[in-house]
Each structure stands twice: as structure tokens, then as C-alpha cells.
């Protein structure tokens, strides 16, 4: 067998004008070769066809450019038949194998084409030498070897039995009807990778093969032979030379690796090679609008494309669903509040009435009468016709379907109705009053009248029953309004709630700690608030219980102390032991109103009562002088200023006692002592106290206290000792904040009375009780002898029988400055502040006795330091 070698190297071409010239030249030479082959037989025709392909390749090689594109040169039918005839001479296993490869749409290597044609030429030469077959026999053999391709079944029409075809990346899957060996042969190809980009070479282009091959080994594939994508690679640079080394000619040769070093298709030169993106497919090009079918597969039918699109949509939908599920699962895991955990009470701003409320909020019977449709009225006919016209405009297609029944409607509406006599009477309100319905066909009543009468009777009964039920619900609500909670009633008084509209469900949602016009609390918030409210209520109740217990205990103690006061008074209050008990009791309980006047007289002047009889001016005598004289105007205005300054602008002022107070002050002004600091406060509080029955008692006790407890010696000691930097008061008020107050102009006896002006009457009397008792004298050991004191003045009496106790006054001032120094700057400023200010401040929830007792305890604590 003579071998043929191709002298020229193939070069890539561009498919522009060169492609059209190359195709035209190839077709012309192919036709000449086909005609010649028909005359000379299968062998000669094959060679002529081969020459035609070679000539076409040379023509394309002459117009080659730097870009490589895929080129398929069409061949004539006679050319294909000549090649088929040459292939039909193959016998034995080669014949069956070649027929199987050609008859099935499966890819084949270029080396397989070469091996097949070499075998066919070698068998043809042996047949020519032995006589061979005639062309007709060859054609018959070809017809038997290559059957007419039949359209595969629906399962085999798709190239793979699995869903690999429907993936996004095109793959070279085997045909469903192909065998396993064909599948291996189809994938047993050589790929060229690395830095050079490879493209698919056209089957009509010749290869530059080694010198061991002859020209007869170059085969042009027929229309049933295919070239696997990626089996051949051509570089973009036109100057590059390629060397193809066929390692093995049989069908079972192994695939060539895709590395640059081991590739059988190597670049000898041509450094300027085209680069491709990593991951890009270099096997073949196809349209995005069609399926990823290789050139070796047939075009898909519409049903196949539909199945492909459906499968791709399902895959994309499943992928999207999985992504969304994953996203929402991640989001749900981060949410603090799930939808299931949303409390229904949070949706509060939607006005919804319960059935018990909405039952009597419906329209009354008069409104229902207006809404009833009268069929015989022409106005109702126009309304119905207008509704039908509007419906025709909105739903033209739907109304066309029912157009047969619509023309009959105006006739029924315009047809005069015979109304029975009983329907023109009063409407029926009870089911028992409904008359017997006439039987259609027997009575002289049409079907329309029968239905209309029945509907009207039932409607009137239903409306009446609804009205009665609404009236009953309304009466029930009105009767239950008096049992509603107080907070709801308060909102009704403010015009923010209607008691009739308050249902049981609303009462369940409303909480007592929030107004009804505000949004209700959530379940969690309501439970938390109820827990806190119950806790505070428990604390308040415990405190109230303790307060009541202490009040009860204090009342019992006061009662016992009052009995002790009476017992001490009977036993002798001027005894030393009695005075000790009296001092102890006075810090716990004030003297009772019944015993105060007698105790004051006994403690301050003993049972002899020498001071009242000798050193005090008589009340009746001064009053008679006042009646006989014209009281000076300037003195009267001075008294009014004193009352306004010390009494009127202070707490507890009452205008009822103004005349008595003015009289006492006038009497004091015309006395030998004259008006003194504190007279107005003493007279005013004694007048408001029940301990003194007459003005004479008040006059004597007030003057007695002024002469004994607040005498001149006590005043001088108070003014000098209270501002002494080494005194007890200075040590108690050692804070730098009191430095500005420790002056003689601020801390003195006159400013001390500013404190007494701000004290309530009950506490004032208790303070006076303590001051009087702390200034007591043990007259049992020092009994007063009237004969010895007959010629003695008041100063002698004070030095011998009066106790000077300025410490009780200084301790009171220190206690007020330490514990109640708020609302005023100093004792001098205390005179000019609001008249409602008092010491101590009282609250409505706290008992006055408890506050007064607390004040006395603090004062006693400071007095112990003196």
C-alpha cells in the first residue's frame, strides 16, 4: 500500500470573505471528484474525493489568518456515496465496527478516521488485485452497512438517561442508545490546556502528520462521522507550527493528559498565543437560547426543549426555596419576638364591639324600613337597572354569558303586583301571628306573590326580634352601669367613656392601674404590675398595721400617763419624787386639758399661790380701768400690728378669738409690765386651748409663765450662751453652714419666738408643758412662807424660788435648726415666709400625734446634751 504525505502545514483561517471563497472552491472540486468516482469505482472515487478535500484544504490554507474558527465544508451526496462505497469493502469485524460507528451519532477521534480509511484502502487494493467487486456490489454493501437513520424514541432522544444534561455546564454525555464501548471511545480524547487557548478544528482540514504516513491515509469524514470537541487544538497565532504524534492507532488508545508538557499537540513557536479565562469552555460554542447539546447530537424537538426548560425551572425554584429557607431560619433564630409570642392584647387600637354591644348599636326599625326594596316602585326599578348597567360596564364578558336571563328582568320588575290585603296592615312581630301561606296553584296567588309575602313576613318578624333583643341588651347595660369599677365611672364623668358601651370583655382587658382611654396592658406587663402593686400594697398594709398598732399603743400609753398625772397631782406634785416622774412623763405625753391649769399653778407657785395674789395684777381691776379710760390710738394700732405680725399670718389663725385677744393685749399694755415678747403667742394659743375656762385663767397663767419661765435672767442667759463658741449649742451646730447664723442678731430670745409662731396649737401646748415642768421647784423642801415674803419684792422671790432654765429653750432652737431647717434661711427669716409654713410639716396620711411625738423625741435627744 502506497502511503501519501501532506506537504503543506495547515493554518487557521477566518470565516469572513475567505470562508466563502474556500467553500465555493471546495464544492466545485468535490463535485468533480464525485463524478469521477462514480465512473472509476469506489477506490478511485475515494481517492478523487480525498484529492478534492486536500485541494480544499490547500485553498483554505492559502487564505488563512491569525484567528481560528470552526469550519465544516459541505460535501455533495455523490461524494458521500463514493466514500461509503469505499468503506463498504471492509469485511469481518472491521466492517461491523465501522458500520456501527458510522450509523450511530457518536463522536470519533481523528486517529480512528485515519485507521478506518487506511484499513479500507488496504482492503480495496487487495480486492482490485484479486478481481474485486463491481461498483454495484459496493453500493449494495454500503446500503446494507449504513441503514437510514431512524428518529430515536423520546427516552433516547435526550443524550443521557440522567439529568446531567440539564446542568448549567455543558458536558459530553453519551447517547442513551449507545453502548459502553462507544461511551469510552467518545470520551477518550486528547485535550490541550495550559497557557494556550484551544479551539475545535473543522473535520475538513488536513493535519500535518509525520513522514511515516502517506497521502492515502488522510480521510474526509462523511455526514455521519463526528469529531469530538476538544480532540484537536489550534493556536490563535498563525505562525505557530504543530506536531501531532499518534501514539497508538487502535481504538483503545488512552487519553492524552491536559498538561502542557505531556500534550501531543505542542507549540513549536508562537509566543503570542491567546489567553482564555479560567474555567471557560473551549470545546465548542453554542447559543444561549438553545440547550447545551454538543455538535455530535441532534437538535432537540420542541417537546424536549419544553422538558428541559421545565426541569431547569424546577431546579432553580428548588434552589431558590432552599436559599430562602436558610435565610429565614437564620433570621428567625435572631429574632427576640416570634410571631407566635405576640400577645393579642397589643393590638388594641382596632375598634371592635362585642356581640352584646353591637346588638343594640344596630340601626333602628325606621332605618330598616327605608332600606326595604319595594318591587312595584318605579324608583326601585331605576335603581336596579342602574346597578345592572354598572355591572355590565365592569364585567362585560360575565354579563354576556347571562344575557339571556337579563331581558326578562325588566318585565318582572314592571309587572304590576297584586298585594294581599293583610300585607297592607301593621307588620307582623311574632312567628305565631304569621298567617297561613297560600298554596300556589290552588289559591289565586302567583309564585312571585307567594315568595314576596313570605319574605316580608319573615323579615318583619326578624327585625322585631332583633329590636327586642337590642332593647333588652340596652336595658341590661343601663342597669349594670352602677356596678362598674370606680375608674370607669370617673372616666365617664370626664366625658371619656360611655358606661353603656362597657362590656364584660372590655372589663377583662381594662386594668385598675391604667385609664380606660389608654391602651390596655399586655399580659406580661399586667402580671408584672399586679405583682409590684401587690408587693407595695402589702408593704403599705404592713406599715399601716404597724402604725395602727403604734397609735393604739400610744393612745393606751397616753391614757395611762393621764391617770398618772392625776395620781401625782393628788399625791403632791411638788414632791421631789413626783417631780422626777412628772419630768419623765412629760416627754411622752402632754398634760390633759382637765389637769393643765391646776398643774401649772401648782408647779409655778406651789399651793400657796403667792405669785398670783401678790406679784400679778388683778384681771378684774385692769379691766375696770380699761373700761373707764380712753385707750390710746397709737397703742391700739400697735396691738393690731402685733396681732397681724405674729398671729394673723401664721398657721392656725382664727378670727373668732380676735376680740378676746385684743382685750388681753390691751390689759397687758396698761399693766406695770407692759407688752412683752411672746404675749400674743401665749394668749392666742391659750384662747384656742380647752384647758382654760375663763379669760382670768388665761391672764394669770400667761403672766405667770412670763414671770417664771421667761424672766429677765433667763433671757439674758439665753442670749449670751446660745452664741458662745465654747457653749453646748455651738458644739451641736458645729457645721460650717451654721456659721452665718451664729450671731446675736439672728440667734436671740426674740427670734426664738418665731419658732413658736410656726408651731401648731397642740404641739405648742405640749412644748409649754415641758418648759413649765422643767422649770419646776421642789416646794416641799422649800416651802413658801407668806409672812417672810410680805415685804419682799419680785427679784427676791425669783432668786429664792424660781428656777432659771435657759437650756430647755436653747435645745429647742438647736433641734429645729438641725432637724427642720428647710424652707427658711435662718430664724429671722422665719418670720417673713409663707403663713402656711409650720414646724413640723404635717401630711394628710400621717397622724398629727405621731408627728408631734417625733418632734418631741428629737428635742429630748438634743436636750440630753445640755
UniProtKB/Swiss-Prot annotation:
Residue segments, region Disordered: 24-49, 72-94, 119-199, 249-282, 390-424
Segments of skewed composition (Polar residues): 153-180, 189-199, 273-282, 397-408
Comp. bias (Low complexity): 79-94, 252-263
GO biological process: fungal-type cell wall organization; protein transport
Domain of life: Eukaryota
Subcellular location as annotated: Golgi apparatus
CC terms in the record's Gene Ontology section: Golgi apparatus
Entry keyword Cell wall biogenesis/degradation: yes
Keywords: Cell wall biogenesis/degradation, Golgi apparatus, Protein transport, Transport
Coiled-coil zones: none
Cysteines joined through disulfide linkages: none
Family (UniProt): Belongs to the SBE2 family.
Function of the protein: With SBE22, is involved in cell wall integrity and polarity processes like bud growth.
The name this protein goes by in its record: Protein SBE2
